[in-house]
Amino acid sequence: MKLAICSGYFNPMHIGHLDYLQSAKDLAEKLFVIVNNDYQVSIKGSTPFMSEVDRVRIISTLECVDKVVLSKDLDDTVLKTLKSILIQHQACGRNSFIFCNGGDRGSENTAEEYFCDNNNYY
């Protein structure tokens, strides 16, 4: 089974996010979404529009999303959460995985892309 993982603040959720998540689901059988936590919103410098609880609840109602995970990271990445999901995914004998970034990311590599590149994930 191929797993796609997306992450985002979704603060607030908008149509671009929906397109991003639906496109990611088209690439895999399952879609997991990591929602950045309230602490990460504060260190990003964003104004909290919705709480992490509300953002998780909204994302979990989307038909294209199979599982929502609240980020446990305390920096501006989702590396700890991503690694945790991958360990569980591989423990079930699955190793096909895609990490998807939204269109608002620049051409520079994110920490997550660097991790995936160095571990032969796509």
Q: Each PLM stretch: what is its role?
A:
Residues 1-122:
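Nucleotidyltransferase catalytic core that binds NTPs
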